[in-house]
Amino acid sequence: MNKAASKTKVPASARSGFGRARPHTHAAAPQPKSEPLAESPPAPIFRVAGVQMASGPNVAANLNEARRLIEMAVEQGARLVALPEWFACMGLKDTDKVSIREKDGEGPIQKFLSDTARRKKIWLIGCSVPLESPESARVYNSMLVYDDSGKRVARYDKIHLFTLDLGKEHFSEERTIQAGRDVKVVETPFGRVGLSVCYDLRFPELYRAMKEVDLIVVPSAFTETTGRAHWETLIRARAIENLAYVLAPAQGGYHLSGRETHGNSMIVDPWGVVLDRLPRGSGIVVAGINPTYQAQLRDSLPALKHRTIQRV
């Protein structure tokens, strides 16, 4: 190994109790000037976690696995936990999600999320919950946010529906998914959290429409083909251009349907540094979110204030 590379410094964001942060060969984050914040006490660091699964068609089994992994995250101090896209069901066929649809506010998946958030005293983000749509053959791909009392505080319906026609891989979510319309940001004790799902990641204008957010959450089930080519690049790009943390829990592995998902759940800081990553299989990623560090970065590189083309 190149000696210089072996001495790469992990940025301050990855050293202050930030879970399993690992050195990377990416450029280390600078030490931002602290003068503008000198009179203010540092904001507390809080820990977030993303769950990675390789879900199957059995909802009860998936909920049990999600519960186990959430408990693991709580044991590591996470106060906000996000589940991957379709955590409760990766069916044998696309229409399976329609067959387990739930009414808004009712059903076993929503009850699981509410009860778990309340019992573990965490903020919990569950995606995807297949909620009823006006069309009986389609459901909403809904992302639900519960506070630490178990109360639902936000719902986001996936806006951009994935289509792929590449060799032997064919996907068309619009056959079974009803597209959402509304951009959603939720106010939390941890700052403004922007909600998005999987394919949304390819549309930077969605994140601009969120205005200024502190944390972006993007539960996903990227295919191995598209994930290998684009996943990390897209995650880090959204973090860098918005100077925001990104929490990206993902499906990762082989599924009974024959589908392979990319995994590589990760947490990325506002400088684009990967703080934690899980390549494959069930598990969690955990890292600390440092609001003071983020504010200093935004002060040192005020790109968000320099936008001159305002389209949204």
Segments predicted by a language model, with ranges:
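Short beta-strand scaffold segments in enzyme catalytic cores
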Residues: 126-128, 142-145, 184-186, 265-267, ...
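Short, glycine-anchored, charge-dense loop/turn motifs used at functional sites
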Residues: 48, 145-153, 268-276
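Beta-strand-turn-beta hairpins that frame and shape the catalytic cleft
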Residues: 39-48, 185-194, 215
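N-terminal, active-site-proximal structural segment of metallo-dependent hydrolase catalytic domains
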Residues: 6-16, 21-80, 86-90
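Active-site catalytic loop in hydrolytic enzyme cores
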Residues: 102-105, 134-211, 224-233, 296-303
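Cys-nucleophile CN-hydrolase/nitrilase-fold catalytic domain and related Cys-dependent amidase chemistry
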Residues: 59, 68-149, 155, 224-244
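CN hydrolase (nitrilase-like) catalytic-core segments centered on the catalytic cysteine
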Residues: 104-125, 192, 198-285
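C-terminal beta-strand edge segments of enzyme domains
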Residues: 2-12, 16, 21-36, 43, ...
